[in-house]
Amino acid sequence: MSFDFYNELSRGCQAMGIELDRPGQERLYTYFVELKKWSQKVNLIAKGTGEAEIVENHFLDSLALLPLLPEGAGLLDIGTGAGLPGLICKAARPDLRLFLVEPRAKRVSFLRHIVRTLQLEGVEIYCSRIEDEPELFASEDISYITSRAVSDISGFLAMTEGFKSPHIRRLCLKGPRWQEELAEADEVLAAGNYQREKVVEYLLPFSGAERAIVVLR
C-alpha cells in the first residue's frame, strides 16, 4: 500500500491543532518529495528514515512552531540543515519573513533548490555560522530565533547572545529533558536577564513522543 502523504499530514495537523490550507499542503508535499530525492545523495536526514517518520518527526514537529508565529513574523533559524524547522514553516505560511543560517554548502544548495521550486519570497540564506554574520545581530526584521537539534539551551543562548533586542523571542524546540536543560541554564539565563515566557508541551500524534517549545525573552 502506497504512503498517503496528505492523509498523514492532515491527521497529524488535526491532532496537533494546526491549520493548513490546501496550497500549504501542496508545497509541503513537493518539499517531502524533494527531501527524499536529495537525501539519497546529500546527508539531510538520517538514512533509513521512513516516510511516516519524515512527516511526524520532521514536518509535524517543525509545524508545531506555527501557532507561536504571528502573521509576517521574522524568523531566524540557526543551523537549519534541511530547513527544519524554518523552511517547513515558511512552506506552510509564506507570510513569514525567513532567515536561514547553515554552514554546510550541500545543504544550502538543497535549501536554495526548495526556495526556487516552491517560488518562495522573503527568504535569506546564509552559508555560514551565526557568529560570522554580525549584521544579523542588528536586524530589525528578526523577531523570533529558533534552532532544532543543534545545542542545549545554554549553548543556544550563548550562540545568540549578540541579539540584544528585548523584543526578540527565542523558541527552543526540545524533547522530554527540557526541564533539566532549563535548570542547567539557570546561570546563563540570569546573566543575560532572560525570562521564561512560557512552555508549550505537546505529543507527536502517532508515536506519542514528548516535545516542548521553551519560549525565552
UniProtKB/Swiss-Prot annotation:
Gene Ontology cellular-component annotations: cytosol
Reactions performed catalytically: guanosine(527) in 16S rRNA + S-adenosyl-L-methionine = N(7)-methylguanosine(527) in 16S rRNA + S-adenosyl-L-homocysteine
Annotated compartments: Cytoplasm
Known EC number: 2.1.1.170
Binding site for S-adenosyl-L-methionine: G79, L84, I130, E131, R148
Keyword terms: Cytoplasm, Methyltransferase, rRNA processing, S-adenosyl-L-methionine, Transferase
InterPro entries: rRNA_ssu_MeTfrase_G (IPR003682), SAM-dependent_MTases_sf (IPR029063)
Stored Pfam families: GidB
Principal location: cytoplasm
Keyword flag Methyltransferase: yes
Domain of life according to the entry: Bacteria
GO MF annotation terms: rRNA (guanine-N7-)-methyltransferase activity
Role: Specifically methylates the N7 position of guanine in position 527 of 16S rRNA.
Family to which this protein belongs: Belongs to the methyltransferase superfamily. RNA methyltransferase RsmG family.
The protein's name in its UniProt record: Ribosomal RNA small subunit methyltransferase G
Species: Desulfotalea psychrophila (strain LSv54 / DSM 12343)
